């Protein structure tokens, strides 16, 4: 019987382009394979033992003959390739239509709305990850107080401001107003409000990021777990991605490792239910990304040694992020599905799942909740023979 599930979702953890990847310009995407090649091999022995090496030919990662976990790949049925798409589908909600793609940066009419609400000119406005924009425009922002603006090229608009330029609570409120103002235009599903701290040389995200977006259009695993009386904890951006619906409590963090710390702490406090954490490990510079991924792998034993009978751990991703691509933004890829836990089966090939909703369905069944709207549970495959 499963009593507690720890779901670790690594942002951009791709293992190869999906069949429709070419439609997104991602036909050759393979996040982990290309990352490993760039650094002459990854050292991730704990992920290796879970079965990661069975999913792709990743330099430095063996295809072990006796994995301690069950392994497979998750695909996505929903169009798109960002965290909203990934998390919602994992939660059991498949979107039918893709959001408008902003291939030329933040549209001028949206820039006008943002500048009107802030009462200031914006800087940036292009397609990039936040770290790139901070390096490019951090000095100008510190000198002028102008909000740094960017998009992922899809349905997300990001806004960053230093705490000295605007109080974090006021900044969040204005970003909330922006989300309301642009929702009717159908351009952005999500507005990210990222407060900053430090000086230009050390400018970095501050704890307190908020993601403002529409609620999921259907019943999610969070809803059914909440209805069944389960404890549901979101670490990182999870709470905001579901507009808080069905979650007991949120634990915002400023980094992937801080999120992992939070998970370790929650294992001593949460006796049952679901703990889900978003882990942003793939920095834009490949060397740093490799170090962080390897550092995460080294810390996995901290998690494993705290598990008890009735626990299940799932390690997966929400989309790819192939850092060999110039934009270094999200890519349309399969993501790993690695599952382990005391008294669970070892070495079972879970195959290539056509939809990430299989995760939500499995979690709902394992914790005794009603079915979510879509997805096929793989719980039976995890039972020891």
Task: For each feature predicted by the language model, list its residue ranges.
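Feature captures the catalytic ectodomains and active-site-proximal regions of enzymes
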Residues: 1-385
């Amino acid at each position: 019987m499963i009593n507690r599930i720890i779901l670790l979702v690594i942002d951009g953890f791709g293992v190869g382009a999906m069949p429709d990847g070419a439609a997104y310009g991602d036909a050759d995407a393979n996040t982990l394979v290309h990352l490993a090649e760039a650094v002459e091999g990854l050292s991730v022995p704990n992920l290796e033992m879970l079965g990661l090496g069975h999913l792709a030919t990743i330099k430095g990662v063996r295809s072990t003959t006796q994995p301690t976990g069950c392994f497979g790949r998750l695909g996505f049925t929903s169009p798109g390739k960002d965290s909203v798409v990934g998390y919602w589908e994992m939660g059991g909600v498949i979107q039918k239509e893709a959001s408008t793609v902003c291939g030329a940066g933040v549209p001028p009419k949206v820039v006008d709305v943002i500048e009107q609400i802030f009462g200031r000119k914006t800087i940036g406005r292009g397609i990039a990850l936040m770290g790139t924009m901070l390096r490019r425009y951090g000095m100008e922002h510190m000198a002028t107080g102008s909000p740094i603006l960017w998009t992922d090229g899809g349905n997300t608009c990001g806004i960053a401001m230093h705490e000295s330029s605007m109080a974090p609570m006021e900044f969040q409120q204005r970003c909330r107003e922006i989300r309301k103002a642009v929702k009717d235009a159908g351009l952005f599903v999500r507005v990210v409000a990222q407060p900053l701290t430090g000086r230009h040389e050390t400018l970095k995200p501050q704890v307190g990021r908020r993601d403002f977006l529409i609620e999921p259009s259907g019943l999610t695993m969070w809803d059914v777990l909440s209805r069944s009386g389960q404890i549901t904890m979101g670490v990182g951006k999870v709470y905001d991605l579901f507009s808080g619906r069905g979650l007991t409590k949120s634990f915002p963090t400023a980094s992937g490792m801080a999120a992992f710390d939070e998970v370790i702490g929650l294992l001593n406090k949460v006796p049952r239910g679901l703990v889900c954490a978003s882990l942003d490990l793939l920095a834009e510079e490949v060397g740093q990304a490799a170090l962080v991924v390897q550092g995460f792998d080294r810390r996995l034993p901290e998690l494993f040694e705290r598990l008890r009978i009735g626990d299940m751990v799932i390690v997966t991703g929400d989309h790819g992020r192939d850092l060999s691509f110039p934009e270094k933004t999200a890519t349309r890829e399969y993501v790993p599905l690695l599952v382990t836990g005391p008294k669970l089966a070892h070495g079972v090939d879970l195959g290539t799942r056509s939809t990430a909703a299989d995760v939500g369905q499995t979690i709902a069944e394992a914790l005794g909740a009603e079915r979510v709207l879509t997805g096929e549970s793989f719980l039976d495959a995890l039972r020891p023979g």
